[in-house]
UniProtKB/Swiss-Prot annotation:
Protein name from the UniProt record: tRNA (cytidine(34)-2'-O)-methyltransferase
Compartments it resides in: Cytoplasm
Catalyzed reactions per annotation: cytidine(34) in tRNA + S-adenosyl-L-methionine = 2'-O-methylcytidine(34) in tRNA + S-adenosyl-L-homocysteine + H(+); 5-carboxymethylaminomethyluridine(34) in tRNA(Leu) + S-adenosyl-L-methionine = 5-carboxymethylaminomethyl-2'-O-methyluridine(34) in tRNA(Leu) + S-adenosyl-L-homocysteine + H(+)
HAMAP family: tRNA_methyltr_TrmL
Organism: Burkholderia cenocepacia (strain HI2424)
Keyword Transit peptide: no
């Protein structure tokens, strides 16, 4: 299945929504510290309802600890960013891919984004005068498109 990586998320309900999404799609969730809230935050738990127990989630102290623990294939990692040049609809996603998202207010740090080749810095299409999409909405669009490409493997 797919892997969702949130780097330093700040808004508890967004993370709660992503937990619920991962529970319902089978995607694995990785949270990279620092987090902008405690994991027992009531707003996050409310947004995730009772799906926390069904989601596969791991917390990593920083990016390097994440890479060491998970050993993701760099060729199958995609950084989603408003500064991306790769076109979302040009990618053929595969089960096991890693989708990396930055925080709600800052996005991915430049030093992290630079580790991704240009074609793996992906931007979702949107109206030209708008800043960005909501983090949890963006994650949902990406995961469902990837899952669709995989034939909704494991879905009912």
């Amino acid at each position: 299945m797919f892997n969702v990586v949130l780097v330093a998320p700040e808004i508890p309900p967004n993370t709660g929504n992503v937990i619920r999404l991962c529970a319902n799609t089978g995607a694995h969730l990785h949270l990279i510290e620092p987090l902008g809230f405690p994991l027992d935050d009531a707003r996050m738990r409310r947004a995730g309802l009772d799906y926390h127990e069904y989601a596969q989630m791991r917390v990593h102290r920083d990016w390097d600890a994440f890479v060491a623990a998970e050993t993701p294939d760099p060729a199958r990692m995609f950084a989603f960013t408003t500064r991306g040049s790769g076109r979302f609809h040009d990618h053929a996603f595969l089960s096991g891919d890693w989708f990396v998202f930055g925080s709600e207010t800052r996005g991915l740090p430049a030093e992290l984004l630079e580790r991704f080749p240009n074609e793996q810095r992906v931007r979702l299409p949107m109206r030209p005068d708008n800043r960005s999409l909501n983090l949890s909405n963006t994650v949902a669009v990406v995961v469902f498109e990837a899952w669709r490409q995989a034939g909704f493997e494991g879905g009912a």
